[in-house]
Amino acid sequence: MGQQQLLLIILGVIVVGIAVAVGITMFSDSATNANRDAITNDLVNLASRAQQFYRRPTSLGGGGNSFVGITKDAAGLAKLTNKPSNGNAVYSISAAGAGTGTASTVEIEGLGNETGTDGSTPVKVHVKVFASTDSVWVLN
């Protein structure tokens, strides 16, 4: 009888260990997905601000139907937001509307604080902003 009880205790410990491991994995996946969704939401908001800049006349501090002025540095990002990072990610301009003429796109990237699907690098989401639309894709 003592041996049977010992086997039941060992079996119970194994089952609890497996349940804890599965729970941790599910929590980690959920945290990654939540971070990815939050970054996507922030990027769509920044894309909307970039489109507002595009449409705003140059006399009012906008682009005058161009993304020229939204540069890859802090000054370019400051035209879209005064907070280049938040609890979700750090944001940057990955391809700017810099140069002369009419720049037709700008690309913004968010680097999250959770590990992405590859298991080693952070979540990364990218948005390409056009004059009247945007395209979002998840890089990790």
At which residue positions do the language-model features occur?
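N-terminal alpha-helical signal peptides/signal-anchor transmembrane segments
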Residues: 42-58
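Glycine-centered small-residue hotspots that permit tight backbone geometry or close packing
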Residues: 1-2, 95
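Periplasmic/extracellular, small/polar-rich flexible segments of pilin-like filament-forming proteins
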Residues: 55-140
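C-terminal juxtamembrane segment of a hydrophobic transmembrane alpha-helix
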Residues: 4-32
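Membrane-proximal amphipathic alpha-helices
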Residues: 32-43
